[in-house]
């Protein structure tokens, strides 16, 4: 299966039969290069990706300043050090799951709930980890 198919079929899917979808999603390499993305995934800056990569290596580095994606600031919430970063911006947010070789990113807005985004992103991330990815 191509990385684009994972984005289209597993991240941008209908969430639990509700007719709701993530706003955008992507799969990136651990160096921040985009492997596949949805049509509306924001164009981030290299320094923003460096901050996210550093947060996975040193949990808590983004909490004081927030996390930025394409200039949009997300307040960093609890996550799982080295594995998951969660952020909130207004009525929406972001979830990023790190695997052995990639980062799975999902961005959502209402009516999608934070837990729904986390479930979609982390489920794919866990699957890829099980596959040695």
Swiss-Prot record:
Which keywords does UniProt give here?
A: Actin-binding, Allergen, Cytoplasm, Cytoskeleton
Keyword hit for Cytoplasm: yes
Q: Gene3D superfamilies, per this entry?
A: Dynein light chain 2a, cytoplasmic
Q: Where primarily located?
A: cytoplasm
Subunit notes for this chain?
Answer: Occurs in many kinds of cells as a complex with monomeric actin in a 1:1 ratio.
Functional description taken from the UniProt entry: Binds to actin and affects the structure of the cytoskeleton. At high concentrations, profilin prevents the polymerization of actin, whereas it enhances it at low concentrations. By binding to PIP2, it inhibits the formation of IP3 and DG.
Q: Which molecular function GO terms apply here?
A: actin binding
**Under what name is this protein listed?**
Profilin
> The organism sits in which domain of life?
Eukaryota
Keyword check for Chaperone: no
Q: Which InterPro entries match?
A: PFN, PFN_euk, PFN_sf, Profilin_CS
The listed locations are: Cytoplasm, Cytoskeleton
Q: Which family does it belong to?
A: Belongs to the profilin family.
Query: What GO CC terms are in its UniProt record?
Result: cytoplasm; cytoskeleton
List the PROSITE patterns. PROFILIN
């Amino acid at each position: 299966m191509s990385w684009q198919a994972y984005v289209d079929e597993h991240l941008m899917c209908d969430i639990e039969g509700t007719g709701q979808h993530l706003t955008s999603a992507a799969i990136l390499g651990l160096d921040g290069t985009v492997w596949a993305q949805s049509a509306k995934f924001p164009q981030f800056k290299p320094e923003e990706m460096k901050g996210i990569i550093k947060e996975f290596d040193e949990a808590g580095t983004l909490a004081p300043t927030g996390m930025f994606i394409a200039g949009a600031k997300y307040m960093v919430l609890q996550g799982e050090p080295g594995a998951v970063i969660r952020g909130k911006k207004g009525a929406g947010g972001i979830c990023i799951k790190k695997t052995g070789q990639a980062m799975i990113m999902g961005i959502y807005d209402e009516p999608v709930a934070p837990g729904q985004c986390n479930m979609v992103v982390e489920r794919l991330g866990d699957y890829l980890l099980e596959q040695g990815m």
